[in-house]
Amino acid sequence: MLEKFSKWKGNRSNHTTPSHSLDESAIPKHVAIIMDGNGRWAKKKGLPRIAGHREGMKVINKIVRKAIDLKIEVLSLYAFSTENWKRPRTEVDYLLKLPERFLKLELPNLMEENVQVRIMGGLDTLPEHTAKAVTKAMEETKDNTGLILNFALNYGSRYEMVEAMKQVAKEVETGTLSSDAITEDVISRHLMTADLRDPDLLIRTSGEIRLSNFMLWQLAYSEFWFTDVLWPDFTEHHLTEAIAVYQKRARRYGGV
């Protein structure tokens, strides 16, 4: 574990790097990003925290376009966790308006780029305006066949796994599933990412080295890349750098 932690630290970045030459045949198909550091970015500039969230929303546009250019198949973004409800009410209210604003501005472009919008998380406890906006985006883009833009909104991985196990238990109770037939694949099929491949690469900004209850099951064999760069300062070059590092690694999935 200590050896791996050292490797993670060794792959952290705190500056923008020149464009890397990538192997187009080895682009990760699913990239997941924990977009962290908006509040710290704002604090460093003497601005309110919501200014950092507003700036961070602009970065999403750039990264989505770069993901399309790189032919990434799935981009999962951790937008709002189940723990984020503990933040100040004014900040929570602002955060939950951002999906509506983003989709209002970007939905025409996402349609033009053949992007399919998905949401994983508890929509039923979101404000009505937020739930309506994301539901509309999912409905309008459901037949698109390009990049899957998967927002984790009101999402927590432990909650996701508990709900999955409840569904499995119910199937066992009703006799539609034998307890002996419960496998990793069965559990995976009951997660919110049931029809998505697991992430190949996880990126986390802001220098924090933890998963923060994000896709704990799905990230079991993902490659991790951490950067000190705060999310509002994250650029297409950082995404390319992360992928370049990913391409140098040997994914053994527990083997030799």
Swiss-Prot record:
One of its GO terms (biological process) is polyprenol biosynthetic process. Mg(2+) binds at D36, E223. Keywords: Magnesium, Metal-binding, Transferase. The active site is at D36, N84 (proton acceptor). Its EC number is 2.5.1.-. Catalyzes the condensation of isopentenyl diphosphate (IPP) with allylic pyrophosphates generating different type of terpenoids. Homodimer. Its cofactor is Mg(2+). Residues 1-22 are annotated as: Disordered. Belongs to the UPP synthase family. GO terms for cellular component: cytosol. This is Isoprenyl transferase. SUPFAM superfamilies: Undecaprenyl diphosphate synthase. InterPro entries: UPP_synth-like, UPP_synth-like_CS, UPP_synth-like_sf.
